[in-house]
Amino acid sequence: MDERILVDAQTMDRMLMRLSHEIIEKSEGAKELCLVGIRRRGVPLAERIKANIERISDVKVLLGALDITLYRDDLKELFPMPQVHGTNVPFDVTGKIVILVDDVLYTGRTARAAMDALIELGRPAAIRLCVAVDRGHRELPIAANFVGKNVPTARDEFISVRVDKVDGRNEIALFRRDA
């Protein structure tokens, strides 16, 4: 497998801090923000953004985790025996601005599934999307409001956002699977 590190741990820290500042700026006047990480790697990214926002502002940040496994339209193709990790959104989303956090925006199908799952929990005032990487190739009309890095890719290339809590390190890699 041919792999290239695009973002190292230090650069990833700066990228997440920049995203945190952007979220604060575009949520001007908000006393409370709701970050909901999409399982699996969106959750630790949301945790880091929450910590940054609370460190640099007086905005209260509510944090949740969303499992979209059962909302995917490709569930049967990808996961004959899906593992459900559970949703944990310990606050009412109704009337709130909710920022969904994910690692990679690709086809838009994960973001669509996350919106479906979130709307079942209530009626947010607005849903925004924050991703570490936007790699293009959309199949649905979805765009992120906050993007850490735009990485145009070929269809046979993949992006791996690695986070310490899941992968033991923080970095973003581009790779091509062996044929």
Annotate the PLM regions:
Residues M1-A179:
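PRPP-associated nucleotide enzymes
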